[in-house]
């Protein structure tokens, strides 16, 4: 512990303590702490966990969320010089890896956790005068350290795991001890296998479960879970429910074709089991609270206390979403916009794909009678922006040729579409007193657990079978398709039946395709699309799912005489590999750090 305050990782983390710990590594007023007695100062030790939590992104408008979608067939950057756009079309340079921040941040977070766990310094530190409360806090912080380390390794593995240039399926370097700069040999930094990295994540989850509170909710009749230390006081922190969510996410990734060459179905079963645990808690425990969870009730992205949430980031009041996603005519910049392919992925209101004649889809009126989730996620020509409080019309999207929001103008979408999901409809740049809203990232939420369960459970039982897990895969998808939108608009299939879901549930192949499309539309702009396309790819040399032509639409005509819709090509993705590259400089520094296949020149 002598050199604990000098710790940093060679993996892109030089200066960690100088920059990262300055917020909490402060002496008392008389300056009386040093390297030997720093554990006497609980704010320092607790600060390791506080800092590890604070490193998580707190806005969807980053490279990892909406930006990541722009690397797929869901969205595109308006700015052609954006590093993520250049990366996806094959014109990037080795110095412009847009995902390096994930690598750096994750290893910073891991190192803070390792510092807390080293020699049990964190759990042996006294934080509070009241003994009972102090012991509860010690346990929760110990659980936080383990699960945050698991979380950051999951993030690293999802981003950088893959087949290396040596032909092996690799994970990331696994470090479970604080690293001292003067003793760290760059040659010792090696990637664990993919399986070994998963096993480390699951071990940390098992360790965390011993210490974490059951649920970050207030239980008035339970003394332990109603202390000021647990319950809602820990909102935004992990509990055993979100821990099981992390397990479900990890097992689903591990079970997927890209990472499961032997086709081990027990991984799918574990993913389904943990997702079902989370779902059952929502359905049978949180549903009993006042204002608790109800799967038949929608939610708002601006309601950061809504029971949809399982694990959430820190929150902040900002206008980033609005100024980045609206067109310039309404105070925005159209930084990232939806594609025609994503628009086409939303079914008709009766649940059928628009490619199915039974959908009633009319290509001359492409936005009519669509699944209401489409209108809640995407602005199209003719969409109205209405104030959330009184339904006042504030703006109308005019993206037909000649309109104020048409492609080719400053600050307008090249595809003719704009992202509606996440924007606050109480914001108007022309108000005398502009109102903003709180925003956060919903890292885990109810709908995501439904998707994990539907996908995983359908691999080990039939879509209609609810006997194995207490819920059927079909029911999990029905929860999504029957639910009112985030704007409160009712589901057509909830009121009139969902024959297409019934049809798909009778065919494993159709059900699998439906699950994949529900992943796409339910979590659009949340950063999952690239990872989903990759994990579903059994042959790593098959790039057809990611190297696609990105389309928009050119709209001519007017409302009176009718519109004509002509597909346009915006760009073509040109990835050399389904794997993302490790940061170039770190591969150069560490001679035994194997680069991912397809990025041989980045070493």
Q: Over which residues does each language-model region extend?
A:
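C-terminal substrate/ligand-recognition segments
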Residues: 372-482
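Membrane-proximal, proline-rich intrinsically disordered regions
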Residues: 21-72, 291-297, 347-368, 378, ...
């Amino acid at each position: 512990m002598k050199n604990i305050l000098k710790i940093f990782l060679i993996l892109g983390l030089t200066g960690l303590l100088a920059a990262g710990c300055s917020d909490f590594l402060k002496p008392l007023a008389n300056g009386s702490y040093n390297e030997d007695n720093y554990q006497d100062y609980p704010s320092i030790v607790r600060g390791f966990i506080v800092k590890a939590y604070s490193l998580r992104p707190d806005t969807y408008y980053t490279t990892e969320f909406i930006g990541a979608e722009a690397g797929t067939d869901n969205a595109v950057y308006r700015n052609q010089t954006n590093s993520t756009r250049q990366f996806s079309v094959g014109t990037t340079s080795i110095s412009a890896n847009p995902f390096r921040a994930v690598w750096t941040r994750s290893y910073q977070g891991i190192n803070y956790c390792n510092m807390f766990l080293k020699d049990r310094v964190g759990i042996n530190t006294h934080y509070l005068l009241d003994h009972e409360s102090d012991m509860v806090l010690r346990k929760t912080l110990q659980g936080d350290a383990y699960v945050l380390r698991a979380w950051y390794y999951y993030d690293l593995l999802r981003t950088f795991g893959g087949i290396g240039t040596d032909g092996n399926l690799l994970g990331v370097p696994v470090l479970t001890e604080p690293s001292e700069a003067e003793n760290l040999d760059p040659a010792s930094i090696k990637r664990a296998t993919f399986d070994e990295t998963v096993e480390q994540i699951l071990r940390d989850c098992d360790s965390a479960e011993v210490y974490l509170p059951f649920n970050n909710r207030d239980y008035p009749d339970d003394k332990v879970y109603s202390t000021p230390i647990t319950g809602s006081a820990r909102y935004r922190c992990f509990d055993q429910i979100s821990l099981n969510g992390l397990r479900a996410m990890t097992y689903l990734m591990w079970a997927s074709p890209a990472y499961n060459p032997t086709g081990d179905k027990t991984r799918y079963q574990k993913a389904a089991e943990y997702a079902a645990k989370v779902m059952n808690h929502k359905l049978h425990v949180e549903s009993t609270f006042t204002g608790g969870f109800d799967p038949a009730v929608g939610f708002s992205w601006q309601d950061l206390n809504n029971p949809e949430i399982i694990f959430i980031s820190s929150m902040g009041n900002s206008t980033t979403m609005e100024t980045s996603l609206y067109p310039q005519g309404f105070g925005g910049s159209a930084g990232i916009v939806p594609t025609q392919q994503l628009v086409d992925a939303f079914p008709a209101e009766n649940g059928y794909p628009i490619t199915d004649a039974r959908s009633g889809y009319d290509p001359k009126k492409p936005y009519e009678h669509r699944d209401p989730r489409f209108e809640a996620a995407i602005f199209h020509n003719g969409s109205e922006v209405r104030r959330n409080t009184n339904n006042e019309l504030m703006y109308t999207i005019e993206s037909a040729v000649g309109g104020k929001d048409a492609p080719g103008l400053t600050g307008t979408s090249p595809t003719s579409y704009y992202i509606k999901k996440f924007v606050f409809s109480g914001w108007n740049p022309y108000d005398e007193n502009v109102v903003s809203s709180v925003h956060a990232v919903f890292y885990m939420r109810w709908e995501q657990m439904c998707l994990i369960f539907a996908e995983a459970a359908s691999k080990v039982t039939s879509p209609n079978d609810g006997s194995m897990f207490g819920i059927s895969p079909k029911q999990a998808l029905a929860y999504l398709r029957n639910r009112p939108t985030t704007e409160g608009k009712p589901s057509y299939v909830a009121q009139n039946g969902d024959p297409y879901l019934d049809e798909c549930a009778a065919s494993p192949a159709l059900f699998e395709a439906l699950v994949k499309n529900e992943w796409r539309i339910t979590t659009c702009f949340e950063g999952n699309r690239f990872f989903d396309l990759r994990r579903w790819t059994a042959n790593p040399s098959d790039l057809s799912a990611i190297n696609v032509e990105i389309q928009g639409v050119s709209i001519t005509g007017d409302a009176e005489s009718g519109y004509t819709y002509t597909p346009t090509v915006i760009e073509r993705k040109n990835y050399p590999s389904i794997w993302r590259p490790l940061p170039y400089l770190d591969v150069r520094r560490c001679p035994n750090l194997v680069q991912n296949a397809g990025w041989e020149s980045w070493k």
